[in-house]
Amino acid sequence: MAEKLSILLAQTNPIVGNIEYNRDLVLDTIDKNKSADLIVFSELILSGYPPEDLVLKSAFQNKVCDAFHEIMDASVHSNSYIVIGRPWKENEQLYNAAIVLYKGKVFHRHLKNALPNYGVFDEKRIFAAGNENSFFEIKGNKIGLFICEEIWDSDTYSKIEGEYCDLVITVNASPYEQQKIKKREDLAMLLSQKIDAPVVYVNQVGGQDEIVFDGSS
């Protein structure tokens, strides 16, 4: 039987390229919220969003990996499952990923399927696309994990048709524009109806160059 979960939505202000600062944001949040069953951070929090060409540099990727391993080590002392957005290299391909940590190990990973390539977004040039839905289980709860554009993409809804889960998490770096909050709410409601489960939506705040992130988690 599924148990109740306490969930922390970590709405933070990461900085593109400042990996040490972003790492410390994550570590501080974990340390101050030890009673949470699940801590959810925003899309690509370790690199900042949008990372653009920085993420193609091996030195940058190595720094992200170092910061990630520091967080992994710290998670040994936490009872929380921790969802972290980061660039992720696998089979010589670079992905936009959401990683679930628990007790010093990678418990689950999701590779973003739908890559936006319009307006301020340029992900297809930088990342490879994943190709599978992503579910994991905590305390008897089956949880679906999505990254930003996936809930805007019609293919996502055809792929999850008939799937069952207890909760959906979507991690985001979604910029502000007029009427954007209502659009997000409408999408979250559609996703909730399709999969018959509540939706947890986490976004970041702050500004990167000309892009403003309004949070609204």
Task: Kindly give the residue locations of the regions a language model identified.
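Enzyme catalytic cores with a strong preference for nitrogen-chemistry domains
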Residues: 1-217
